[in-house]
């Protein structure tokens, strides 16, 4: 009951300072909303006793002006209609000003590669729609920083993403439908970095409800260390903008300046791949990258980039750069073999596996993992298999496919064992892929099978080959 006298006195002070609404009931509701809003977002709670003791309304007027200034309203110091209207709009649950306990000292991640995990799902959207919205939201920040992100399916990630209602274990309960949509914590261990979404909202892919992508992009800005912005055009403005044209969405300059003040501009970082000195970047000793006869030994993704291996070199293709970069394999990973047979990435383990002959190696970024090489037969392949031609891992199904001559085996990444019922004929399950597979990787929802100097674009949903391309078409040749 301690809160009741405070609330009543607050009503007396504010109502005596300026007129609010005609209805006393509206006055009470407005005062209650004002108190909660200022307590939640403008640090009123620690100051309440001070202005009560002084019997002076100047502090509450000052707090209202502070709120109005931050939200871009006219600084009347009064609970006018424009202020009331904005206070009723859906918004982020993170405070706008004042000391927020999880944001001391402008924290940031002390690494460039960050993992995330979607702990549970809202029933409002298909799982793949939630996955896509979160991936797209992270991409917004990845495109303007050196940061890269990968998703894991179990264990503790840097950013744990969850949907919840009411009290959900962090002592910052959600309020039901409307108003508070989500909240997130600044970078750090434990709960820090995590993002929580109110599952009492109606989450949508468009703006007919609460758009998950827009809210996620905002909250993940907090997970990366950003505060709220006072600029209404910014993604980090605290109030949700349902009128946003999703087809024309882009970060404001204020958002870009803020995130780059923490992490810098989009350049390669040591946590992804350390670019060697120019003396190590040699001209190809094999076929030039635009040669019509060029073929690859292996192809794999690595943290959003694509690596094309050939002899003792590899081309590194990033979405941020129009042209691939060419390096010695040994300049990044001294122990890896040249003329490798296959390579694939398991994104939820942040690991790339490299195969040559009957052995395989493992790398994480520029780090070579201990305990390798291992025999390919430890994976459950029969002794008759002497080498692997190509491999790819499906991050959604958590299955890895090993291609050997005209057959393939399937490995369960969760159980860490080969699945029964294999091998199967490649041509039966991948119609149109009739020749031997040299390499394979996934991009844009398609599988790209390489055979000699050609590649087949395969639609796994339609189960058919959609295009036949040159192997080096990725190099703008």
Curated annotation (Swiss-Prot):
Chief location: secreted
GO biological process, any: cellular response to UV-A
Entry-linked InterPro entries: Hemopexin-like_dom, Hemopexin-like_dom_sf, Hemopexin-like_repeat, Hemopexin_CS, M10A_MMP, MetalloPept_cat_dom_sf, Pept_M10_metallopeptidase, Pept_M10A
Gene Ontology cellular-component annotations: cytosol; extracellular matrix; extracellular region; extracellular space; mitochondrion
Propeptide stretch(es), residue numbers: 18-99
UniProt source species: Mus musculus (Mouse)
Phylogenetic classification of the source organism: Eukaryota, Metazoa, Chordata, Craniata, Vertebrata
SUPFAM superfamilies registered for this protein in UniProt: Hemopexin-like domain, Metalloproteases ('zincins'), catalytic domain, PGBD-like
Protein name as catalogued: Stromelysin-1
Signal peptide (residue range): 1-17
Each Hemopexin repeat, start to end: 287-336, 337-383, 385-433, 434-477
Active-site residue numbers: 219
Gene field: Mmp3
PANTHER family, per the entry: MATRIX METALLOPROTEINASE (PTHR10201), STROMELYSIN-1 (PTHR10201:SF215)
Disulfide pattern: 290-477
């Amino acid at each position: 009951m301690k809160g009741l006298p405070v609330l009543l006195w607050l009503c007396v002070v504010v109502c005596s300072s300026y007129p609010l609404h005609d209805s006393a009931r509206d006055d009470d509701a407005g005062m209650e909303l004002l108190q909660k809003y200022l307590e939640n977002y403008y640090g009123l709670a620690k100051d309440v006793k001070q202005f009560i003791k002084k019997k002076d309304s100047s502090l509450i007027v000052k707090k209202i002006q502070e709120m109005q200034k931050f939200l871009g309203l006219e600084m009347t110091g009064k609970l006018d209609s424009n202020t009331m209207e904005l206070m009723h709009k859906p918004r982020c649950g993170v405070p706008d000003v004042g000391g927020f306990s999880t944001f001391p000292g402008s924290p940031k991640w002390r690494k460039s590669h960050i993992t995330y995990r979607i702990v549970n799902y809202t029933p409002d959207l298909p799982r793949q729609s939630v996955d896509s919205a979160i991936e797209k939201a992270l991409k917004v920040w990845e495109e303007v920083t050196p940061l890269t992100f990968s998703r894991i399916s179990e264990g503790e990630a840097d950013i744990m993403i969850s949907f919840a209602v009411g009290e959900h274990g962090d002592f910052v309960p959600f309020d039901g439908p409307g108003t508070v949509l989500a909240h997130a914590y600044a970078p750090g261990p434990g709960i820090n970095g995590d993002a929580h979404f109110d599952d009492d909202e109606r989450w949508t892919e468009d703006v007919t409800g609460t758009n998950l992508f827009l809210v996620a992009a905002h909250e993940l800005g907090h997970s990366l260390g950003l505060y709220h912005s006072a600029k209404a055009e910014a993604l980090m403005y605290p109030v949700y903008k349902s009128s946003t044209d999703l087809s024309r969405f882009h970060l404001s300059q204020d958002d870009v300046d803020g995130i780059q003040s923490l992490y810098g501009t989009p350049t390669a970082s040591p946590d992804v791949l350390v670019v060697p000195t120019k003396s190590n970047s040699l001209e190809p000793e094999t076929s030039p990258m635009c040669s019509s006869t060029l073929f690859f030994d292996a192809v794999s993704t690595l943290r959003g980039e694509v690596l094309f291996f050939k002899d003792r070199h590899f081309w590194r293709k990033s979405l941020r750069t129009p042209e691939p970069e060419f390096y010695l394999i040994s300049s990044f990973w001294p122990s890896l073999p040249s003329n490798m047979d296959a390579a694939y990435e398991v994104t939820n383990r942040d690991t790339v596996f490299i195969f040559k002959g009957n052995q395989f190696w493992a790398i994480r970024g520029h780090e070579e993992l201990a305990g390798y090489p291992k025999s390919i037969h430890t994976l459950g392949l029969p002794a008759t298999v002497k080498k692997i031609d190509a491999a790819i891992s499906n991050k959604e199904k958590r299955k890895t496919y090993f291609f050997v001559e005209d057959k393939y085996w399937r490995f369960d990444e969760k159980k860490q064992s080969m699945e029964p019922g294999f091998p199967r004929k490649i041509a039966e399950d991948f119609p149109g892929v009739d020749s031997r597979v040299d390499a394979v990787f996934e991009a844009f929802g398609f599988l790209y099978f390489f055979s000699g100097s050609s590649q087949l674009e395969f639609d796994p949903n339609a189960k058919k080959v959609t295009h036949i391309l040159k192997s080096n078409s990725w190099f703008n040749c």
